[in-house]
Amino acid sequence: MSKQTPSAAEPLLTIDQLHVQLPKGSERTYAVENVSYTLAPQEILCVVGESGSGKSLTARAIMGLLPEPHVHYEKGQILFQGEDLTKASPNRLRQVRGGEISMIFQEPMTALNPVMRIGNQIDEVIRFHVKKSKRERQQLALSLLEDVQLPDPPRILKAYPHELSGGQRQRAMIAMALALEPKILIADEPTTALDVTTQAQILVLIKELQAKHNTGVLFITHDFGVVADIADRVAVMQHGKIVEIGSADSVLNHPTHPYTQALTRAVPSLIPRSVKPVEDNPILEVKSIVKTYRSGGGWFGMGAPEKEVHACDNVTVSLNEGETLGIVGESGSGKSTLARCIVRLLDTDSGEIVYRGQDLCKLDRAGMRPLRS
């Protein structure tokens, strides 16, 4: 394992030879084995590795959120500003969580309470840790939503999680995590479920807020594109162990461990590869399809004006036999609607979908059934 680059600042967090044990009969003894690293103020340390490598369990151990008794801490130290959190009382850990160390989870829809308004959830975090009047808490909540660049903060305060987009829910989670200006922010794959445009915005936001609040960020991910964007240092985990750690430049551009080298080689390149020519023999042709979603209008046209969303507007694509066609775009661009129209889960407003010379738009359910099976 390469040596860890020392930080000029005194570490906020020091993980020293941490061991987290798995239940008997598991494939390996430890979920986390002999893990050591530090995190300094204003530093972003990215922890990367495939699923099951121990990234998230290390973070949960820091927060005192291991799924005990089946998965439990065995030995090692977790030093937060010199205090060993493995020896902290449950009451002390509750003070640390949210107040001094906060966490952003991968899927805010499961982390947020679905039956509580966003404002009430932020208020709950503030009320638990500090003494402020209701008006002061409300002003702080509004300020936090402004900081994470959510539109119309008063409306967001009154909204339920399901009424927000995925990116808005993640921003609300970040607002909650930063409510008490924690010294450490743990981000557990917070952009995985987001489209690339929203992901880029969230990464910029985390960097801006980190600099503003002098926060150390422990960023857990499997995406080397994210690592290249934000990391100061990188720790690579495999089978519960750190196999390589160093500056982002050294790990990404000059990896020394075979596993890290394999991970970096697996990152798709934007340089076009030499590909086998594909004959111009379309197996599928989508010709000028239109699909519009309509909502509103109320009963007998007495409600709000009808709204129209043009999900697919004159879309034309073709797919040759033996060819792979990639369709990309941000959330709401019409990718999934196009796919659903092709398999006739949605009816198009106009256009043709021709498969092997047959227009699928003219087939009934019985005619489509053998094509779907």
Language-model segment annotations:
Residues 13, 32, 96, 284, ...:
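Conserved structural motif at the start of ABC-family nucleotide-binding domains
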Residues 71-72, 85-102, 128, 250-255, ...:
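ABC ATPase NBD coupling module
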Residues 179-183:
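A short, proline-enriched helix->beta-strand linker immediately N-terminal to the Walker B motif
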Residues 233, 245:
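Short, glycine/charged-rich "phosphate-handling" switch motifs in NTP-dependent
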Residues 63, 343:
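Helix-to-loop junction immediately C-terminal to a conserved catalytic motif
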Residues 72-84, 351-359:
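Conserved ABC transporter NBD signature motif
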